[in-house]
Protein backbone atom coordinates (compact mmCIF):
# COMPACT_ATOMS: atom_id res chain seq x y z
CA UNK A 1 0.00 0.00 0.00
CA UNK A 2 1.35 3.40 -0.98
CA UNK A 3 0.77 6.18 1.55
CA UNK A 4 0.74 9.43 -0.42
CA UNK A 5 -0.23 13.08 -0.10
CA UNK A 6 -2.05 14.14 3.04
CA UNK A 7 -2.35 10.52 4.17
CA UNK A 8 1.41 10.56 4.66
CA UNK A 9 0.86 13.40 7.14
CA UNK A 10 -1.88 11.34 8.80
CA UNK A 11 0.60 8.54 9.34
CA UNK A 12 3.16 10.90 10.88
CA UNK A 13 0.52 12.38 13.18
CA UNK A 14 -0.71 8.91 14.15
CA UNK A 15 2.80 7.88 15.14
CA UNK A 16 3.17 11.07 17.17
CA UNK A 17 -0.07 10.29 19.01
CA UNK A 18 1.10 6.77 19.85
CA UNK A 19 4.46 8.04 21.08
CA UNK A 20 2.71 10.65 23.22
CA UNK A 21 0.25 8.23 24.80
CA UNK A 22 2.86 5.57 25.59
CA UNK A 23 5.06 8.26 27.20
CA UNK A 24 8.50 6.93 26.31
CA UNK A 25 11.62 9.13 26.32
CA UNK A 26 13.38 9.52 22.94
CA UNK A 27 16.24 7.24 23.97
CA UNK A 28 13.81 4.32 24.31
CA UNK A 29 12.79 4.41 20.63
CA UNK A 30 14.55 2.56 17.83
CA UNK A 31 13.96 2.09 14.10
CA UNK A 32 15.25 -1.30 12.99
CA UNK A 33 16.37 -2.49 9.59
CA UNK A 34 14.47 -5.36 7.98
CA UNK A 35 17.25 -7.93 7.78
CA UNK A 36 18.10 -10.95 9.90
CA UNK A 37 21.04 -13.25 9.41
CA UNK A 38 20.06 -16.79 8.56
CA UNK A 39 21.49 -17.79 11.96
CA UNK A 40 19.23 -15.30 13.76
CA UNK A 41 16.21 -16.43 11.78
CA UNK A 42 16.94 -20.05 12.63
CA UNK A 43 17.38 -19.10 16.28
CA UNK A 44 13.92 -17.54 16.29
CA UNK A 45 12.40 -20.78 15.01
CA UNK A 46 10.11 -18.81 12.70
CA UNK A 47 10.60 -21.04 9.65
CA UNK A 48 9.72 -24.06 11.78
CA UNK A 49 6.40 -22.58 12.89
CA UNK A 50 5.55 -20.38 9.88
CA UNK A 51 7.38 -21.70 6.79
CA UNK A 52 4.49 -20.53 4.59
CA UNK A 53 4.98 -16.91 5.70
CA UNK A 54 8.78 -16.86 5.62
CA UNK A 55 10.53 -14.43 3.28
CA UNK A 56 14.24 -14.58 2.50
CA UNK A 57 16.70 -12.34 0.67
CA UNK A 58 18.61 -13.93 -2.20
CA UNK A 59 21.23 -12.67 -4.62
CA UNK A 60 21.72 -13.73 -8.22
CA UNK A 61 24.17 -16.62 -8.49
CA UNK A 62 27.64 -15.41 -9.49
CA UNK A 63 27.76 -17.97 -12.26
CA UNK A 64 24.63 -16.40 -13.76
CA UNK A 65 25.85 -12.79 -13.71
CA UNK A 66 27.35 -12.81 -17.27
CA UNK A 67 24.12 -14.23 -18.68
CA UNK A 68 22.04 -11.55 -16.92
CA UNK A 69 24.45 -8.82 -18.06
CA UNK A 70 24.18 -9.92 -21.69
CA UNK A 71 20.41 -10.24 -21.56
CA UNK A 72 20.58 -13.98 -22.12
CA UNK A 73 18.98 -14.67 -18.75
CA UNK A 74 16.06 -12.78 -17.24
CA UNK A 75 14.57 -12.73 -13.79
CA UNK A 76 11.28 -14.59 -13.86
CA UNK A 77 9.24 -16.95 -11.71
CA UNK A 78 11.30 -19.90 -12.85
CA UNK A 79 14.62 -18.53 -11.61
CA UNK A 80 15.88 -20.25 -8.43
CA UNK A 81 18.97 -18.82 -6.71
CA UNK A 82 21.06 -21.51 -5.05
CA UNK A 83 21.85 -19.61 -1.84
CA UNK A 84 19.98 -17.53 0.72
CA UNK A 85 22.03 -14.72 2.20
CA UNK A 86 19.60 -13.11 4.65
CA UNK A 87 16.04 -13.46 5.95
CA UNK A 88 13.48 -10.67 6.06
CA UNK A 89 12.06 -9.52 9.39
CA UNK A 90 8.49 -10.82 10.00
CA UNK A 91 7.81 -8.86 13.22
CA UNK A 92 9.54 -5.82 14.68
CA UNK A 93 9.75 -7.09 18.27
CA UNK A 94 12.05 -9.98 17.29
CA UNK A 95 14.91 -7.50 16.95
CA UNK A 96 14.38 -6.37 20.55
CA UNK A 97 14.81 -9.91 21.90
CA UNK A 98 17.72 -10.80 19.65
CA UNK A 99 19.65 -7.69 20.69
CA UNK A 100 19.33 -8.63 24.36
CA UNK A 101 19.99 -12.35 24.30
CA UNK A 102 22.16 -13.47 27.18
CA UNK A 103 21.69 -10.17 29.03
CA UNK A 104 20.59 -9.49 32.59
CA UNK A 105 18.25 -6.50 32.95
CA UNK A 106 18.44 -4.22 35.98
CA UNK A 107 14.76 -3.22 35.77
CA UNK A 108 11.64 -3.59 33.65
CA UNK A 109 11.68 -1.39 30.58
CA UNK A 110 9.51 -0.58 27.58
CA UNK A 111 11.01 -0.17 24.11
CA UNK A 112 9.26 1.64 21.26
CA UNK A 113 10.29 0.23 17.89
CA UNK A 114 9.34 0.32 14.23
CA UNK A 115 10.44 -1.57 11.12
CA UNK A 116 9.32 -2.62 7.67
CA UNK A 117 8.26 -6.28 7.98
CA UNK A 118 7.70 -9.01 5.41
CA UNK A 119 5.41 -12.05 5.30
CA UNK A 120 4.52 -14.17 2.28
CA UNK A 121 0.80 -13.91 2.94
CA UNK A 122 -1.29 -16.89 1.91
CA UNK A 123 -4.53 -14.87 2.03
CA UNK A 124 -5.80 -12.46 -0.65
CA UNK A 125 -3.95 -9.14 -0.68
CA UNK A 126 -5.77 -5.82 -0.34
CA UNK A 127 -5.22 -2.38 1.21
CA UNK A 128 -5.17 -4.03 4.65
CA UNK A 129 -2.90 -6.96 3.82
CA UNK A 130 0.31 -7.03 1.80
CA UNK A 131 3.63 -8.85 1.65
CA UNK A 132 5.41 -5.91 3.29
CA UNK A 133 4.09 -3.55 5.95
CA UNK A 134 5.23 -1.17 8.67
CA UNK A 135 4.87 -2.49 12.20
CA UNK A 136 5.19 -0.12 15.15
CA UNK A 137 5.42 -1.82 18.53
CA UNK A 138 5.75 -1.00 22.20
CA UNK A 139 7.54 -3.91 23.86
CA UNK A 140 7.73 -4.55 27.60
CA UNK A 141 10.59 -6.64 29.01
CA UNK A 142 10.73 -7.42 32.71
CA UNK A 143 8.69 -8.71 35.62
CA UNK A 144 5.57 -10.81 35.00
CA UNK A 145 3.21 -8.27 36.57
CA UNK A 146 4.75 -5.45 34.54
CA UNK A 147 4.18 -7.38 31.31
CA UNK A 148 0.52 -7.90 32.26
CA UNK A 149 0.11 -4.23 33.18
CA UNK A 150 1.63 -3.20 29.84
CA UNK A 151 -1.10 -5.14 28.03
CA UNK A 152 -3.81 -3.51 30.13
CA UNK A 153 -2.36 -0.05 29.57
CA UNK A 154 -1.98 -0.70 25.85
CA UNK A 155 -5.62 -1.73 25.70
CA UNK A 156 -6.65 1.44 27.53
CA UNK A 157 -4.68 3.52 25.02
CA UNK A 158 -6.33 1.74 22.09
CA UNK A 159 -9.75 2.24 23.71
CA UNK A 160 -9.03 5.97 24.04
CA UNK A 161 -7.84 6.36 20.45
CA UNK A 162 -10.74 4.48 18.92
CA UNK A 163 -13.27 6.33 21.07
CA UNK A 164 -11.89 9.75 20.17
CA UNK A 165 -11.70 8.81 16.48
CA UNK A 166 -15.27 7.46 16.66
CA UNK A 167 -14.29 4.12 15.14
CA UNK A 168 -16.33 0.99 15.95
CA UNK A 169 -14.15 -1.96 16.89
CA UNK A 170 -13.98 -5.12 18.92
CA UNK A 171 -11.39 -7.37 20.49
CA UNK A 172 -10.98 -10.99 19.42
CA UNK A 173 -8.80 -13.69 20.86
CA UNK A 174 -6.53 -14.78 18.03
CA UNK A 175 -4.21 -17.67 17.30
CA UNK A 176 -1.10 -17.27 15.18
CA UNK A 177 -1.39 -19.05 11.79
CA UNK A 178 0.94 -21.97 12.47
CA UNK A 179 1.69 -24.13 9.45
CA UNK A 180 1.09 -27.27 11.52
CA UNK A 181 -1.83 -26.53 13.82
CA UNK A 182 -1.27 -29.87 15.57
CA UNK A 183 2.30 -29.02 16.61
CA UNK A 184 3.16 -28.70 20.29
CA UNK A 185 3.66 -24.92 19.98
CA UNK A 186 0.31 -24.45 18.23
CA UNK A 187 -1.43 -26.65 20.80
CA UNK A 188 0.07 -24.65 23.66
CA UNK A 189 -1.00 -21.42 21.95
CA UNK A 190 -4.59 -22.66 21.90
CA UNK A 191 -4.46 -23.72 25.55
CA UNK A 192 -2.88 -20.46 26.72
CA UNK A 193 -3.87 -17.72 24.26
CA UNK A 194 -1.23 -15.05 23.80
CA UNK A 195 -2.88 -12.60 21.41
CA UNK A 196 -5.88 -10.30 21.23
CA UNK A 197 -6.55 -8.55 17.94
CA UNK A 198 -8.23 -5.18 17.53
CA UNK A 199 -10.80 -5.70 14.78
CA UNK A 200 -12.32 -3.05 12.52
CA UNK A 201 -14.76 -4.23 9.84
CA UNK A 202 -13.24 -7.71 9.86
CA UNK A 203 -9.63 -6.48 9.70
CA UNK A 204 -7.04 -6.75 12.47
CA UNK A 205 -5.41 -3.32 12.83
CA UNK A 206 -3.53 -3.83 16.10
CA UNK A 207 -2.77 -6.58 18.59
CA UNK A 208 -2.02 -7.11 22.27
CA UNK A 209 0.48 -9.92 22.79
CA UNK A 210 1.42 -11.51 26.11
CA UNK A 211 4.31 -13.95 25.64
CA UNK A 212 4.81 -14.68 29.34
CA UNK A 213 8.44 -15.85 29.80
CA UNK A 214 8.78 -17.53 26.38
CA UNK A 215 11.31 -15.10 24.92
CA UNK A 216 13.06 -14.65 28.25
CA UNK A 217 13.74 -18.38 28.40
CA UNK A 218 14.48 -18.76 24.70
CA UNK A 219 17.08 -15.98 24.60
CA UNK A 220 18.27 -16.26 28.23
CA UNK A 221 17.25 -12.70 29.12
CA UNK A 222 16.89 -12.37 32.88
CA UNK A 223 15.77 -10.01 35.62
CA UNK A 224 16.70 -10.87 39.21
CA UNK A 225 18.17 -14.16 37.94
CA UNK A 226 14.80 -15.23 36.45
CA UNK A 227 13.74 -15.30 32.78
CA UNK A 228 11.94 -12.07 31.93
CA UNK A 229 8.33 -11.89 30.82
CA UNK A 230 7.48 -9.93 27.69
CA UNK A 231 4.43 -8.36 26.12
CA UNK A 232 3.92 -6.02 23.20
CA UNK A 233 1.29 -3.75 21.72
CA UNK A 234 1.59 -3.75 17.92
CA UNK A 235 0.14 -1.46 15.26
CA UNK A 236 0.09 -2.14 11.52
CA UNK A 237 0.42 1.43 10.24
CA UNK A 238 -0.80 0.78 6.70
CA UNK A 239 -3.87 -0.95 8.13
CA UNK A 240 -4.58 2.08 10.27
CA UNK A 241 -4.36 4.35 7.24
CA UNK A 242 -6.71 2.02 5.34
CA UNK A 243 -9.13 2.04 8.29
CA UNK A 244 -9.06 5.84 8.61
CA UNK A 245 -9.49 6.27 4.87
CA UNK A 246 -12.46 3.89 4.83
CA UNK A 247 -14.01 5.57 7.85
CA UNK A 248 -13.52 9.23 6.87
CA UNK A 249 -12.35 9.50 3.27
CA UNK A 250 -11.03 12.99 4.03
CA UNK A 251 -7.56 13.16 5.62
CA UNK A 252 -8.21 16.71 6.89
CA UNK A 253 -10.86 15.43 9.32
CA UNK A 254 -8.50 12.76 10.59
CA UNK A 255 -5.65 15.22 11.10
CA UNK A 256 -7.92 17.45 13.20
CA UNK A 257 -8.95 14.55 15.43
CA UNK A 258 -5.36 13.37 15.80
CA UNK A 259 -4.27 16.87 16.81
CA UNK A 260 -6.70 16.69 19.74
CA UNK A 261 -5.45 13.23 20.70
CA UNK A 262 -1.89 14.55 20.70
CA UNK A 263 -2.94 16.80 23.59
CA UNK A 264 -4.94 14.17 25.49
CA UNK A 265 -3.80 12.92 28.86
CA UNK A 266 -2.37 9.38 28.59
CA UNK A 267 -4.36 6.75 30.52
CA UNK A 268 -3.12 6.42 34.08
CA UNK A 269 -2.20 3.06 35.58
CA UNK A 270 -5.48 3.00 37.51
CA UNK A 271 -7.53 3.79 34.41
CA UNK A 272 -6.42 0.55 32.77
CA UNK A 273 -9.06 -1.14 34.91
CA UNK A 274 -11.61 0.32 32.49
CA UNK A 275 -10.10 -1.59 29.57
CA UNK A 276 -12.75 -4.05 28.42
CA UNK A 277 -10.70 -6.56 26.43
CA UNK A 278 -10.26 -10.11 27.69
CA UNK A 279 -7.27 -10.40 29.99
CA UNK A 280 -4.99 -12.93 28.33
CA UNK A 281 -3.39 -14.15 31.53
CA UNK A 282 -6.83 -15.07 32.88
CA UNK A 283 -8.06 -16.79 29.72
CA UNK A 284 -8.63 -20.51 29.71
CA UNK A 285 -9.55 -22.83 26.84
PLM regions and their residue ranges:
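TRNA-recognition modules of translation machinery and tRNA-sensing kinases, especially anticodon-binding
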Residues: 1-282
Amino acid sequence: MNVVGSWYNVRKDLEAVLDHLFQLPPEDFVEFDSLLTVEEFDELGYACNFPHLTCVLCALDKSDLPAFASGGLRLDHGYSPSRTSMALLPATCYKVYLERRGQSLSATRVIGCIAKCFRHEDKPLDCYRDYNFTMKEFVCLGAAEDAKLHIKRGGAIIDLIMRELDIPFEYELAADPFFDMSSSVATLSKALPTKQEVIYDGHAVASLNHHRNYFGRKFEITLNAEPISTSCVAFGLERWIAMLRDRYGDPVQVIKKLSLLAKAAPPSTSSTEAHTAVTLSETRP
